[in-house]
């Protein structure tokens, strides 16, 4: 999702390879636009040379600013009418003023908004009615008076200092969303208004004693985690004084309307009933406000422990599953031990579901740098008896087998067709009838590693990447984040008090793998 991938046809590449190598990145819009979209090639589009650089013609610059091109299908779910938050924690460098930091941040986000027009727009819903959830689209939005929202809590006695956060490895309990965010996150919907437009891209900078906490926000109807971290990557590049490479701009500004085809009349739609739930309303929210005393926690798995875990989970694999990933092994461990902590409340034949958010880019043949929503869900079911008695390798194999079977272009196209044909999409969620008492909902960006820890110019490299502590609990939620550039994994989870106590105080096997941060 952040790896730079681009290619040019052989003839053009051979003619310009030396020039291209010398100028791999430059200012926005000094690049080749989508040469291959809709059959375009260097032979049938106009490109110009200026100072040895490939530059888009005015025609293609105009296309990038046509906001209709960013209309998609997978981003149409009302459950995505929320802001996704990612916190980056930095120590404040010596001899660097706040004014310099804020100036660089402001210029960087302005540069990104200019280079990727939909990131400078806002999300609106049109055509909503009693029987339809309407259409989410981006619309023009005047630039904000200030590019970023700034808070100074360095003298706030109720706010932790950076040293305190670092000593405790930034537990989520110390990252209150009320202090470090300006708008709520999932699952609370954000409503566009004249006073506070639902801008696609937002940024909050909060100074604390000895440090800075930056909240990077993106509107979820317009981007998944790939797009979110793609925008952060571009801001970091701008703060380092770098321009944006051709391939990155191509994918960031890619036309979404024909990204992939929906099912045709002779193609059978799969059964997506598991994604249906009653409409989400204020009286019937996505998550019950009476969740069983659940809280959010951060758990760390070191790079060494992850290697050992994968080796253990790879012993005795089913013959039809020749390979499992580190995420498979970690998912199996969490699913098994969460179930062990819950088992006293349920019978052995109780069914548990592991709902896994999956990036569909590879299955669809889409670049990792594409920034729109391409997430779908793969659910795997086992009974409590199976989860508590099966060895880790068998559970990991079961997860991998289902992922291989369902993470296909056909499955994703079918899900998109299902969304497109459903007028009221408020009945559709990734988890469907998710039971927080028995199920686990998992997503992962663990594999990004160094990509999530770039240098931000004068700020340097962040020491922690976190989510803020939400105001709404979502029991059963599980997220894998890179804990460090060296390969550690920080797991962000939400469990009941009795469950987390069982894991961290009574489950000796769990404790040998995981370090509790808080």
Where are these regions (language model features)?
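Non-catalytic, low-complexity flexible loops and terminal extensions
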Residues: 56-59, 63, 69, 156, ...
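Acyl-thioester-dependent condensation/acyltransferase catalytic cores
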Residues: 110-215
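Acyl-CoA-dependent O-acyltransferases
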Residues: 2-130, 298, 305-518
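Short strand->helix junction
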Residues: 95, 221-222
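Acyl-group handling in specialized metabolite and lipid biosynthesis
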Residues: 85-100, 135-173, 292-298, 361-365, ...
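Short, flexible turn/loop "capping" segments at secondary-structure junctions
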Residues: 79-83, 207-208, 289-292
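Short, surface-exposed, charge-dense and proline/glycine-enriched linear segments
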Residues: 147-165, 273-285, 377-386, 439-453
């Amino acid at each position: 999702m952040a790896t730079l991938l681009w290619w040019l046809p052989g003839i053009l590449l051979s003619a310009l390879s030396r020039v291209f190598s010398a100028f791999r990145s430059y200012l926005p819009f000094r690049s080749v636009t989508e040469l291959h979209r809709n059959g375009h090639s260097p032979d049938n589009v106009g490109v110009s040379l200026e100072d040895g650089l490939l530059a888009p013609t005015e025609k293609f610059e105009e296309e990038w600013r046509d906001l209709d091109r960013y209309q998609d299908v997978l981003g149409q779910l009302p459950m995505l009418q929320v802001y996704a938050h990612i916190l980056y924690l930095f120590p404040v460098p010596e001899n660097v003023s706040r004014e310099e930091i804020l100036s660089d941040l402001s210029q960087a986000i302005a540069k990104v908004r200019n280079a990727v027009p939909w990131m400078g727009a806002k999300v609106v819903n049109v055509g909503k009615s009693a029987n339809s959830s309407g259409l989410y689209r981006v619309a023009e939005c005047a630039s904000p008076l200030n590019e970023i929202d700034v808070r100074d809590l360095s003298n706030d006695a109720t706010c932790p200092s950076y040293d305190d956060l670092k000593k405790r490895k930034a537990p989520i309990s110390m990252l209150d969303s009320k202090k470090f965010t300006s708008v709520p996150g999932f699952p609370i919907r954000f409503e566009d208004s004249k006073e506070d437009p639902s801008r696609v891209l937002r940024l909050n900078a909060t100074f604390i004693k000895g440090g800075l906490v930056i909240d990077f926000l993106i509107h979820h109807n317009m981007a998944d985690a790939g797009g979110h971290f793609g925008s952060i990557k571009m801001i970091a590049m701008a703060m380092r004084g770098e321009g944006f490479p051709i391939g990155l701009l191509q994918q960031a500004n890619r036309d979404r309307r024909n990204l992939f085809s929906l099912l045709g009349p002779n193609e059978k739609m799969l059964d997506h009933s598991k994604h249906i739930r009653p409409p989400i309303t204020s009286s019937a929210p996505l998550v019950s406000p009476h969740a069983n005393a659940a809280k959010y926690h951060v758990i760390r798995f070191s790079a060494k422990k992850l290697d050992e875990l994968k080796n253990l989970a790879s012993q005795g694999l089913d013959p039809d599953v020749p390979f499992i990933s580190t995420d498979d092994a970690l998912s199996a461990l969490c699913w098994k031990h969460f179930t062990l902590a819950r088992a006293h409340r349920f019978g052995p034949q109780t069914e548990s579901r592991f709902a896994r958010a999956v990036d569909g880019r590879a299955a669809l043949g889409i670049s990792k740098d594409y920034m729109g929503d391409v997430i779908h869900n793969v659910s795997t079911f086992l009974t409590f008896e199976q989860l508590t008695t099966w060895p880790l390798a068998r559970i990991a194999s079961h997860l991998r087998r289902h992922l291989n079977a369902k993470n296909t272009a056909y499955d994703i196209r079918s899900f998109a067709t299902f969304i497109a044909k459903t007028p009221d999409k408020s009945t559709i969620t990734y988890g469907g009838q998710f039971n927080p008492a028995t199920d686990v909902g998992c997503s992962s960006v663990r594999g990004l590693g160094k990509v999530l820890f770039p240098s931000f110019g004068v700020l340097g490299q962040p020491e922690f990447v976190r989510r803020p502590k939400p105001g709404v609990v979502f029991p059963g939620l599980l997220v894998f984040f890179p804990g460090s550039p060296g390969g550690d994994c920080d797991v962000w989870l939400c469990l009941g008090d009795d469950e987390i106590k069982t894991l961290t105080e009574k489950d000796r096997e769990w404790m040998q793998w995981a370090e509790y941060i808080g």
